[in-house]
From Swiss-Prot:
Sel1-like repeats lie at residues 90-122, 130-165, 170-203, 204-239, 240-271, 291-326. It comes from Xenopus laevis (African clawed frog). It is found in: Cytoplasm. The lineage of its organism: Eukaryota, Metazoa, Chordata, Craniata, Vertebrata. This is LRP2-binding protein. It comes from the Eukaryota. The keyword Thylakoid does not apply. PANTHER family: LRP2-BINDING PROTEIN. SUPFAM superfamilies: HCP-like.
Length: 341
């Protein structure tokens, strides 16, 4: 299970660029055709003038502006300048070192920066502690920058999840659901509990996972109607894993036209990384969702269900599903052999 870093807790005002543009002393727009690039240039000039005046936070804001634009090398340079005075800069630099954004991966340094935040007594670090604790749990789970330990990962994630506190780490709450669903730590009742907490707090990942748990009766009594409701809502919000299982549900209920229509949309995605970044769902589960949809689309083409029969296209899609996720394709092949699909 490849995890992703917890993002910096977001300002309620949105992006740095938008926040800056609303400040009373931000230079006004003189041209009605003010482009995004023009606004960026104005914001950069504005922040650099603040930096010259000794405004430490302006360094962080400039770094965050660069970070949000994907200019990672420039962002890291700004964060490093003020990491000892600004905990948000320290946090972002830690994420960048761990994930290798704008620099070579340095997991140990990333871990060190997160440890500084969770042990800090500074009031400005308080809102970052849950996110930093999630990232430490991730490091222990992956064994990068620190010795692998499932128990330490679990401990940090439980701290970060804070009993389902909506203001705690949403990623920690969701990943605990995944953690308790996977060997050797399987406890499906705990998994259902944590996915429920995370879903209630807005987790798209956990909403899809809950739908699957209801669908198969994992950790909770099987409830197909509740499963479909969860999967539909998650699918509409962009959860590809939920979309794949929704295709499966449509197929099983003989709603072949619906299955084909949804599967076509999913199979047309040719940029998995973009899907992952857009939804912030785990890469492995996003790929599984595409693989499931691809296999069922192949099955419909193979048998002419909800679409004109096309054995050649079906063969290509069966192969594509196996390339995406061999385990998913193998399990669905067994379902064909045993007459389940």
């Amino acid at each position: 299970m490849k995890l992703r870093s917890e993002c910096l807790p977001k300002s309620e005002h949105g992006t740095v660029l938008y926040t800056l543009s609303q400040l009373p002393d931000f230079p006004p727009c003189k041209d009605q055709d003010y482009s995004h690039e023009d606004l960026l240039q104005t914001a950069e000039t504005f922040l650099k003038s603040r930096i010259k005046e000794g405004d430490v936070q302006a360094n962080f804001l400039l770094g965050q502006l660069f970070f949000e634009e994907g200019w990672y090398e420039d962002a890291l340079l700004q964060f490093e300048k003020v990491k000892d005075e600004d905990n948000q800069a320290l946090y972002q630099a830690g994420v960048m070192y761990y994930d290798g954004l704008g620099t070579q991966e340095d997991h140990r340094k990333g871990v060190k920066y997160m440890e500084r935040i969770v042990t800090s007594d500074c009031p400005s670090a308080k809102h970052l502690k849950y996110a930093a604790a999630y990232n430490l749990g991730r490091a222990y789970f992956e064994g990068y920058g620190i010795p692998h330990s499932d128990k330490e990962a679990e401990r940090w994630w439980l701290f970060a999840a804070d009993n389902g506190n909506p203001k705690a780490s949403l990623k920690a709450q969701s990943v605990l659901g995944m953690y308790y669903s996977s060997p050797p730590n399987v406890d499906l009742q705990k998994a259902f509990l944590w996915h429920s907490e995370a879903c209630g707090n807005g987790s798209l990942e956990s909403q899809g996972a809950l739908g699957v748990m209801y669908l198969y009766g994992n950790g909770i009594k099987k409830n197909v109607q509740a499963a479909i409701e969860c999967l539909k809502e998650a699918a509409e919000r962009g959860n590809v894993y939920a979309q794949g299982h929704l295709v499966s549900c449509y197929y099983q209920r003989k709603l072949y036209t619906k299955a084909v229509e949804l599967a076509k949309k999913i199979v047309s995605h040719d940029n998995i990384e973009l899907l992952v970044n857009t939804t912030d769902c785990l890469p492995s589960y996003t790929v599984k969702g595409v693989a499931i949809a691809t296999f069922y689309f192949a099955r419909c083409l193979h048998l002419g269900l909800g679409i004109k029969q096309d054995s050649t296209a079906a063969k290509q899609l069966y192969s594509k599903a196996a390339q995406l996720d061999a385990q998913v394709a193998a399990e669905l092949n067994f379902d064909i052999i045993y007459g389940k699909i």
